A protein has these predicted regions:
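Minor-groove-contacting beta-hairpin "wing" of winged helix-turn-helix DNA-binding domains
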Residues: 79-84
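Short, solvent-exposed beta-strand-terminating loops
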Residues: 25-37
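A short, conserved structural fragment
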Residues: 68-78
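Short helix-capping/hinge SLiMs at alpha-helix to coil transitions
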Residues: 18-21, 35-39, 76-77
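Short amphipathic alpha-helical elements of helix-turn-helix/winged-helix folds
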Residues: 12-20, 32, 63, 90
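Short, amphipathic alpha-helical interaction segments positioned at domain boundaries
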Residues: 86-97
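Positively charged, polyanion-binding regions of nucleic-acid-associated proteins
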Residues: 1-27
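Short, positively charged loop/turn segments that connect secondary-structure elements
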Residues: 2-4, 34-60
Length: 97
């Protein structure tokens, strides 16, 4: 499997945030989403061209950034965020994957 783009990670990330009581970190999301999506070790080792960050971790981070801008996630403190009421309302509508 290839590493999904950040748009494809938005709903799984929001769903993960919605199942947690309280805040999450990108590292927690990376670990859980990698398992849920069935990514291989090779997929997880893939690095950005700069060689400074994993491609998957980067894309999970961008998915979180854009969902924060949309008001679906909110930062709670540095490196932590949680689902908002708006995010919970969206999940309750059962959006298509």
């Amino acid at each position: 499997m290839t590493v999904p783009d950040y748009q494809s990670l938005m709903l799984p990330l929001l769903t993960f945030a919605g199942t947690r009581q309280g805040e999450i970190t990108t590292n927690q999301a990376v670990e859980v989403l990698a398992q849920e999506l069935g990514l291989s070790e090779e997929d997880l080792r893939e690095m950005l061209p700069s060689g400074t960050q994993s491609t998957f971790g980067n894309r999970v981070g961008w998915a979180a950034t854009y969902m924060k801008k949309a008001g679906l996630l909110e930062p709670t403190r540095r490196g932590y965020y949680q689902i908002t009421e708006r995010g919970q309302e969206l999940l309750a509508q059962h959006p298509p994957a």
